[in-house]
Regions:
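C-terminal accessory module of base-excision DNA glycosylases/AP lyases that mediates lesion recognition
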Residues: 2-102, 217-227, 233-343
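Structural motif
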Residues: 103-115, 166-174, 306-318
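Alpha-helix N-cap/helix-initiation sites
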Residues: 110, 127-132, 171-175, 233, ...
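Short, hydrophobic/amphipathic alpha-helical patches that form generic packing surfaces
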Residues: 114-124, 180, 317-328
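A general alpha-helix detector
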Residues: 116-120, 134-137, 158, 162, ...
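Short alpha-helix boundary/capping elements
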Residues: 124-126, 130, 142-143, 186, ...
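Alpha-helical ds-nucleic-acid-binding substructure associated with the helix-hairpin-helix region
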Residues: 143-229, 241-246
């Protein structure tokens, strides 16, 4: 398995393309997490069956072609997993021992704080496999640092121990950064545990939510850079990419796609201009009969049980991260060949 460098080693730090600079319309300014959309358009039924697409096709060396629509559907299917993630990550995710993992847990089931932890780890100079293993180790038993309160209570030494078990590089510095972040986001532990159960509704998390409401992804990234030690542009972009699938946060950030993820999407053969076009493509071109549950492991069975907006958001994040994974795993060619042969 190739030992690929992490996202920030392949991205131009600090750069946001035009589509990333477009800020989502903020809701009313308030010191609460971004509220779910008060008024939603009529619920759309998932599109089924084939639909003609004018989007460009990517040519393969064998003479076969794969259209953007076909690649989109293939990436969202369970058949694409082996080309997007390391084998040991998928084996661990399928084992049933880990309720939270990067590859198979829908991003809508992560809390905002868990997305912060994930962004912190994936933005470090680690290999693809080490980054995901670190996320899995920290967020599941015997550690289970899913809230800032739990991480703060554990202390820096325990965080270091978890990172050592994951065989993570730069353990000491990363443990220190994560502990400081937990201290920053932890609520008042003398109060009831309700805030902890929601991923840390502390004043600091509310400040982050307010930044998202006021200025969209750009303001969110700027706020994180100025308040969370060790988290830069790339970490902020990863956070925005993932947290938009969480209930309430999409109002301020959706739809957001960072430049690295968009580049990966184009590299695998999905030729789109921006995040808005990706959203439109998902809403119009996904064949639900073929995609099914996307191979994701859910607490509640069945993609049709979810709110339509959540479904689209999960697919949006999933297709971006699977495209990134194929690039990082150096399996773009294999992915394209499999997509062309997929029926």
């Amino acid at each position: 398995m190739p030992d690929r460098t992490k996202e920030e080693q392949q991205a131009k730090s600090g750069e946001l393309k035009d589509e990333e600079k477009e800020e989502a319309k903020a809701g009313q300014k308030r010191k609460t997490p971004p509220a779910s959309k008060a008024e939603k358009p009529p619920k759309k039924e998932p599109r089924q069956g084939a639909r003609a697409s004018a989007r460009s096709a990517g040519k393969l060396g064998s003479g076969a072609t794969v259209t953007s629509k076909q690649m989109l559907n293939f990436l969202l299917s369970k058949d694409a997993l082996e080309y997007c993630y390391p084998a040991d990550e998928l084996e661990a995710a399928h084992s049933g021992k880990f309720s939270k993992n990067y590859s198979l847990t829908p991003p809508s089931l992560f809390t905002p704080f868990e997305h912060l932890v994930t962004a912190h780890l994936l933005s470090k100079p680690l290999s693809h496999v080490l980054g995901m293993r670190s996320v899995r180790t920290l967020l599941n038993p015997p550690y289970g640092y899913s809230t800032p309160e739990e991480m703060k209570k554990a202390g820096e030494d325990k965080i270091y121990q978890a990172l050592e078990q994951a065989k993570t590089q730069h353990r000491q510095k990363t443990a220190a950064y994560l502990f400081e972040m937990a201290e920053l986001y932890a609520g008042d532990l003398s109060k009831d545990a309700s805030s902890a159960s929601h991923g840390g509704d502390s004043d600091t998390m509310l400040d982050l939510a307010e930044a998202a409401n006021d200025g969209g992804p750009r303001a969110t990234i700027s706020h994180l850079k100025s308040t969370v030690k060790g988290l830069g542009d790339i970490g902020g972009q990863i956070f925005c990419r993932r947290v938009q699938a969480c209930d309430g946060w999409g109002e301020a950030i959706w739809p957001y796609a960072d430049s690295k993820a968009m580049d990966a999407l184009r590299e695998v053969g999905i030729k789109i201009a921006d995040a808005d076009e990706l959203q439109e493509m998902i809403e119009q071109d996904v064949d639900w009969d073929k995609v099914g549950d996307m191979g994701l492991v859910r607490e509640k069975e069945g993609v049709d049980e979810q709110d339509y907006d959540v479904q689209v958001a999960v697919e949006f994040v999933t297709v971006l991260e699977r495209a990134l994974g194929a690039v990082l795993e150096d399996k773009v060619g294999q992915l394209k060949k499999a997509a062309a042969e997929w029926t």
